[in-house]
């Protein structure tokens, strides 16, 4: 990278950047319409998180961050999920800063154990296999300022991957329905059709998380408990997309 690596200090000003993008040391750029296809690992020297920036954000931008916070709860802490869910559904309610720092702590716990993303850190990818495919496709068919946001794409991905979790990882029907209900608003606000499996498959096959020719997922066993290194068939992924499509 430039000058063999530069020291960097980050001051995230969006909720998504505070709870996710600024920590963990991953950098990435989109390439040939694939999400984060080129990147490296480089930790910031310092990260200054100031929640006072948040009142300047539109609600759509806040929702992007809430989705990643919901994900942190879904994979590791049910009580955190329940607390964030309240704020996500009550968009005019001020966000408790302690929830921001707890989300950061959940991510850091995974990163510290597995900086290079070869094991437990993969659990942070819940929702992102489908989410990145949806986001990449949207970038192709839409102008950049009209394309599906990262938070919305990951939220939709979490619906599909929760369905897959119910088929492969033992997620209960009650948990699946609860997650779906919380994320229903994202589905309702989507201003484009859910792409077919044929359209999404090239993006899924190029996902950087894959091992050999298999499409790799991190899946929920229950709310607050996630495991990594599942693979799903094309047929099952298509079922998950149908499940999402029927919610619109």
Model-derived segments and spans:
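A secondary-structure boundary/capping signal
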Residues: 11-12, 126, 219
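A glycine/threonine-rich phosphate-anchoring loop and its flanking beta-alpha core
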Residues: 1-89
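Alpha-helix initiation and N-capping motif
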Residues: 59, 63, 77-81, 97, ...
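C-terminal charged capping/lid subdomain of soluble metabolic enzymes
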Residues: 67-69, 171-248
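Active-site segments that bind and position negatively charged phosphate/pyrophosphate groups
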Residues: 83-198
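Anionic group-transfer/hydrolysis microenvironments
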Residues: 14, 52, 127, 137, ...
């Amino acid at each position: 990278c430039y000058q063999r690596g530069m020291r960097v200090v980050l001051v995230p000003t969006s909720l998504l950047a505070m709870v996710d993008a600024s920590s963990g040391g991953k950098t990435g750029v989109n390439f040939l319409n694939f999400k984060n296809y080129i990147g490296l690992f480089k930790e910031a020297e310092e990260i200054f998180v100031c929640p006072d920036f948040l009142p300047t954000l539109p609600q759509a931008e806040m929702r992007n961050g809430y989705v990643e916070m919901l994900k942190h709860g879904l994979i590791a802490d049910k009580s955190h999920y329940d607390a964030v869910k309240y704020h996500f559904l009550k968009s005019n309610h001020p966000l408790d800063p302690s929830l921001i720092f707890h989300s950061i702590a959940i991510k850091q716990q995974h990163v510290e154990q597995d900086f290079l993303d070869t094991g437990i850190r993969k659990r942070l990818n819940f929702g992102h296999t489908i989410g990145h495919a949806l986001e990449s496709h949207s970038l192709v068919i839409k102008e950049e300022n009209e394309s599906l946001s990262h938070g919305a794409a990951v939220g939709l991905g979490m619906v599909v991957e929760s369905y897959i979790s119910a088929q492969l990882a033992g997620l209960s029907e009650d948990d699946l329905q609860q997650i779906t209900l919380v994320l229903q608003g994202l589905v309702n606000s989507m201003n484009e059709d859910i792409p077919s499996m044929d359209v999404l498959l090239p993006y899924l096959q190029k996902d950087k998380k894959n091992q050999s020719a298999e499409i790799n997922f991190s899946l929920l066993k229950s709310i607050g408990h996630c495991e990594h290194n599942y693979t799903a068939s094309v047929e099952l992924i298509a079922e998950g997309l149908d499940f999402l499509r029927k919610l619109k």
